[in-house]
Design a protein with these regions (language model features):
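Terminal helix/beta-alpha structural elements that buttress the NAD(P)+-binding lobe
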Residues: 1-206
Length: 206
């Protein structure tokens, strides 16, 4: 069951942090959307690289995000992480609910903001819009020393092996919110659409 919850979300987190974000030990990393399917993997993967991790989530998920390794947790219902004096080397943004300038404000001068398939303030549906967002992020980043990168993860066997090693070593554990039967798939989708899933939602095919 845990293995079934890994591939897409964990690869998205791994490639975003390692390949796009160039994560290094000792860096200060912020994960916006830390309690979701990708975010729970991102927190653990960032910790495996030796980063100091801050997770952003709602009140009900604070303990969860702390339990998977976050050094600091920001409750977005009580505090806006873009309105503090804290600066980060890497922002892994899975929500996109802040403007370009707000994200610039909390990045170090040579910091990187990685957006998983988003290019502005808010999620966008459709491949064309996502690619437009990627181009927009690239053009903007040419005018500042900070980098803003939007991407879509690519599945490959090599990264699956990396993730397998993290699972076996105990450095990464899938967080499963709910499990549905195949004939309950519609219910699972409705739950996901609410945007409040903690970790992954799994459909059991047996």
């Amino acid at each position: 069951m845990q293995a079934a919850s890994v591939p897409v979300a964990a690869i998205t987190a791994l490639q975003g942090l390692r390949d796009k974000g160039k994560i290094q030990a000792g860096q200060k990393v912020l994960v916006n959307g830390a309690s979701g399917g990708v975010g729970t993997f991102a927190v653990q993967i960032a910790k495996s690289f030796g980063a100091e991790v801050t997770g952003v989530c709602s009140t009900r998920n604070v303990d969860l995000v702390r339990s998977i390794g976050a050094d600091h947790v920001v409750d977005y219902t009580k505090e806006d992480f873009t309105k503090t004096d804290q600066r980060y080397d890497l922002i892994f943004d899975l929500v996109g609910n802040h403007s370009f300038s707000e994200r610039r404000h909390i990045l170090n001068p040579n910091g990187i903001c990685v957006m998983a398939g988003i290019g502005g303030a808010g999620w966008h549906d459709g491949m064309g819009i996502r690619l437009a967002g990627e181009l927009d992020a690239y053009v903007r980043s040419r005018f500042v020393s900070q980098k803003f990168i939007s991407y879509i993860a690519q599945f490959n066997k090599r990264d699956m092996m990396v993730l397998g090693d993290l699972l076996q070593s105990g450095k990464m554990t899938p967080v499963i919110d709910r499990t549905y039967k195949l004939n309950e798939a519609a219910d699972a989708l409705r739950y996901l659409e609410q945007g409040h899933a903690r970790g992954k939602v799994v459909i059991n095919l047996e």
